[in-house]
Each structure stands twice: as structure tokens, then as C-alpha cells.
């Protein structure tokens, strides 16, 4: 939210098309499962003994389906492995992949409503950072469907596999030691709170591409502090740009 406001307040910013697209980690992963390996990646990266129900939700299983699978898996010596085996059975796997494609259809519709790119365009995905998990999940989907190229631009970007191919950070591994960058990520949650808006994260989209959001966890005091900080930031930008004879 704040990076967009900051950019729009700069002189000459109106020359560049800017759009607010709502894609969360959850929706990016939900739309990215196009093969068995994609489902395996979700299971191997996120499934633990204690979070099988949330993983079932990420795999777009219904609560009833997840309860049945977890119930069967819990009787096995290693429930997490049994859960994965159940999910990867042909019938359930087909459901997951089909639902993910439907989810991707709705996410893509939302994206097109906000951005409306043409084939061959380069779209900059701008965020605070730091690992680029949303970009990693959703960029291949959008690139394949729309014929565009998605590049990430972050305030803070860590050294992740292949980072130099499609992302760059104002504070990034090309300029700073990765140990220093990882130290800064310890405080990224505070920066995220100052940069966001009092709105729940998107959890799905309607058939028309409208975002459906979860509940917001922030309270009135937190919202007031954040609003004051953002107003001060924009005021600083307005004052600072007056010192330039031409836009930086």
C-alpha cells in the first residue's frame, strides 16, 4: 500500500501505468499447482504433523475432504507421509489440479481487470520483499497464460536460487552481504505493518475476479499509528521532491 502511495506522489509518476493487484501467498500458491510435482512441492515445503488441516486448505480441499484424509492418515505410523500419499492418489490429485486451474482462471481475471497488459509486456511486481515467494509461485502462471514477463522489484531481496534472473532489491545481494540482508529480515514484520492498509489479506476471488478478503487482525490504535506514520512519509516525499530541479 505505502510503496504505491509513495510512487504516485513523485513528480512524473502519472506517466507510468500503476495498478494495485491483490495476490497473497495463499492465492499465489493456490493458483500455481499445474502438475503433480507442484503439489509435491507444497507438501514438502509446508506440511508438518501439526498443520495438515491448513495444508489441506492450501491444496483447495474442502474442510470435509481434509477431515477424512487427516483422519485416515492419523492412524498411520507417520501421519504426514500417509497424508501426502492420500493427496497424491490419482482421484484427489486430479481434484487439486482442476481446482487450482479454476483458481488461476479467477486470479488471472482479477489481474487483467487491474493491469490489462498486452502480449510481450514486462510487468514489474513491486513489493517489500524479501524472498519473492508470491512472484515465484504466480509469475510462471501469468507468463504462460498472458505471454508477458514478470520481474520483481523489492525494497529488500535475499539471495535465493536464480534471483538475478527475474528480481532485484534496493537492498539486495548484488550490493550487500546476504548475512546482513538476513539480519534485516528479522524486522521486516514491523515494516510490513507500517506499509500495509487496514484490510484483510485476499483468500480467493469471485468468478468475476473480485477479491474476497479474510478478516483484518489490526485494531483501532494500530490503525491510527500506521495512518500517522504513512502521512508523515508522504509529507516527507512532498517536501524532499521540492529540492530537486527535475524529477530524480
Model regions: which residues?
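Long, low-complexity, Lys/Arg-enriched
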Residues: 1-248
